[in-house]
Amino acid sequence: MDIINFFKQITDHEPYDYQIRAWEKINKIMELGGRVVIEIPTAGGKTEAAIIPYLYQFISNDWKVPRLIYVLPTRSLVEKQVERIRNYIKKILEIKGYSKDKVEELAKKIVQVEYGLEETHAFLGFVVLTTWDTFLYGLAAHRTVGDRFTFPCGAIAQSLVVFDEIQMYQDESLYMPRLIGLVVKRLVEANVPLVFMTATLPTELKKILGIHDEEPITVNPEDTKKPERGEVVVEFKEKLSDEELSNEIKKAINEGKKVLIIKNTVNSAIEVYEKVKQLGNSLLLHSRFTVEDRAEKEKDIDKAEIIVATQVVEAGLDLTNVGLVITDLAPLDALIQRIGRCARRKGERGKVIVVLPNFNEKINEDHREKVILGFKNIPFENAYVTLVNNKDYGRVIELTIETIEEKKGKSKIVPKKFYIGDLGNKTIRKLIENNKILKKKDLYFIPYSTQPYDPLIMIKSFDEVESVSEYLYDIIKAREALDRVYKEYYENNIVPKDYYSAYIYFRELKLFSTPPEYELKARPEMFAILYPLENAEEKVKNKEIIEFNPKYVIRVSYNWLKNKWEKFDKKFELIKEYDEKGWICSLKKAGKLQPYKIYIIDDKYYSKETGIII
């Protein structure tokens, strides 16, 4: 059986032309080492393009690499891919003649998940799905919770490593992309075969990742078998009233279509969910549910008529029959992903409504000359833009425009600085309310909250939204637009001095007992774990032993928890001790908040329907 017939047998589909090209190239690097970049629009079958050469080894018995390590940016994406790949493994085992019971048993052993809560942490499954942070610490022979020794490092060296959704590996200081670029360099030197997959990626990010000199595998115009998706109409509205929202949802449901509403923050998602849940079978999905509740919601997602979610649905989620997507304005790459959730199959028709920032009338009248909607409104030639923390205004964009002035017959370049903030910034909002907008420096502002996103990226994305439907289908146009959006972001991004305290460890792959200090400050995926528990205070008083169940944990952003920490009136830390009977868990009053710890909160702060309530 050749690889094409193998693919047909386990997927019931004909392969696309680009997938066959990818398999040929991946087969070569599995033997000799190297890099492959796959750049395909959403719903184009990238996963199969990357993993089929490895899976085919189970049939051909021609083993070039013994292990596949599949790296994703978030745990939710890992969880989504696990069953998909396990199902392929089950079909392979059935082809090889295993019984149904044995197929189930072996599939679980062959496909392993690794992101910090499992009993073993050695990267020793045939197929290992993991998050970027876990992969990085495994390579450095360290784990943030417990010991890992050097097993994962050895396992990685003998694997085909796939980095999926790499457009999501970004943060304010570009710390993660820089580390990935560093790791890629080391892995290439060790002849580890690497595959990178994305739908959209700025050119400068490719340079940081160290993959800019690789010709990407993509869909060619002359391909006869290629991914095709449905027709999507994109509308833009500056305001969507509750009545309009209700009417749009009812219309879509009456046509037998699903509705997907994507909000930028958890709080705004909950607010919209409460408004629309009576209109049909509704489901709320975001990052602040327990592992068990989130898994249940993801299982039920196909039954829901209305799905309200945050960024967790931007990538890796294959929703069928979505006829209406309503989304907040977001960075261009995220917006392309969101629109890509709609009408994913050939023959489907769908509608997307992008809700543009709502212009507050009072601000509009009183401060019209201070408002910036997008950079198109600023006439400049030479400009430098970066994010700074200004003592008067908080986090703002610093825009420096160079002008040429003539004085006494001589020309000289005169830089002028402007500060631009967004109305999500509490400091700026307070200044506006108190009518103290002029203070030391002129303050211009974006008339909407850009949280949780970089305001610089948001106002550049605002300038591109009218053409976003084109970018869904055309990779080249999408890349050119992303280069425009991220131009200043990358050009002006300065490497923080204390970054090197972490950099040196990973550059030399040194062992370390605790993460470098900058590592704890800079990583956006740094987390803590919350565990809702009934009568937690009583259990502490009575010194009860706690039966810890990983299904009830909620992994939250460390930075988010730091901002909310004082709002939890009762919080405790989980203590794990080992004796001859195994692990014993008890509680103590929580001290200073630290990343990667497990904190117990009262179950009054948690709802199965809406998640953490705070």
Curated annotation (Swiss-Prot):
Q: Which GO terms describe its molecular function?
A: ATP binding; catalytic activity, acting on DNA; helicase activity; hydrolase activity; mRNA binding
Q: Where is the Helicase C-terminal domain?
A: 244-386
Matching SMART domains, A to Z?
DEXDc, HELICc
Q: Which domain of life is it from?
A: Archaea
Give one Pfam family: Cas3-like_C_2
The residues that the entry says bind ATP are: 40-47
Which UniProt keyword terms apply here? Answer: Antiviral defense, ATP-binding, Helicase, Hydrolase, Nucleotide-binding
Q: Which SUPFAM superfamilies match?
A: P-loop containing nucleoside triphosphate hydrolases
Gene3D superfamilies with a match to the protein in the record? P-loop containing nucleotide triphosphate hydrolases
Signal peptide positions on this chain: none
Top enzyme category:
hydrolase
Q: Tell me which residues make up the Helicase ATP-binding domain.
A: 27-219
- Family, as annotated: Belongs to the CRISPR-associated helicase Cas3 family.
- Domain remark in the UniProt entry: Proteins of this family have an N-terminal nuclease domain and a C-terminal helicase/ATPase domain. In some CRISPR/Cas systems the domains are swapped, in others they are encoded separately.
* Alphabetical list of NCBIfam families matching this protein: cas3_core
This protein's name: CRISPR-associated helicase Cas3
Encoded by which gene? cas3
